[in-house]
Regions:
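Blade-edge motifs of beta-propeller repeat domains
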Residues: 2-23, 53-72, 102-123, 160-169, ...
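Beta-propeller blade termini
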Residues: 25-35, 39, 74-84, 126-135
Length: 185
């Protein structure tokens, strides 16, 4: 974790209690895990415990529980609203073992969700990304493969028919995303 002081970065991971010295980090994602309007940190570790850090006062606290924090051969962690219910799910892209999907319930309880698409029980996933590729308001999941040799990209589309969406994209005066903007409807 680095603090940006006018373009000069200072390592503050230890100060904020997110230093994970004994794990082999593979991916990081940001998400509002407790739906408080604050970003929390998801940290994934190769064959080590995965972490879910939430800001508690002036330090972060790991709220991860099993089965979320169980070690896996992880390559990527993504937080996104895959089912269009307004709340993020957490996708873990693993190599040589099934991918996993979690929902964070009230109080920070992690519940594994059965995956219809994207499980890839023996896939050699090396990374993943999420976007609304076809513009229908439902996020697609793109998984890359190829640990050794050629393997294709796989694009997964969720079969969702019972949720609606409204896309609002606040921009600043330069056309960039207006981070921290508040939208009132």
């Amino acid at each position: 974790l680095y603090y940006n002081s006018k373009g000069s970065f200072q390592d503050v991971a230890e100060e904020y209690a997110v230093q994970d010295r004994f794990e082999n980090g593979r991916g990081t994602a940001l998400s509002d895990l407790l739906y408080r309007g604050r970003l929390d940190i998801l940290s994934s570790n190769w064959n080590g415990m995965h972490r879910a850090y939430v800001l508690d006062g002036d330090k972060f606290k790991d709220i991860s529980t099993s089965p979320y924090n169980d070690p896996t051969k992880i390559r990527t962690v993504i937080s996104a609203d895959f089912d269009n219910d307004g709340y993020d799910e957490i996708f873990m892209n693993n190599i040589g073992e099934p991918n996993k999907l979690f929902k964070v319930l009230e109080g920070g309880i992690f519940k594994e969700i059965k995956m219809e698409n994207g499980l890839e029980t023996v896939g050699l996933g090396t990374g993943a990304a999420v976007a609304d590729v076809d513009g229908d308001g439902i996020l697609e999941l793109l998984v890359s493969h190829g640990e050794s040799g050629f393997q294709p990209l796989t694009l997964y589309k969720a079969d969702i028919t019972n949720f609606n969406y409204l896309r609002i994209k606040p921009l600043n005066q330069y056309g960039a995303p207006a981070r921290g903007a508040t939208v009132t409807m």
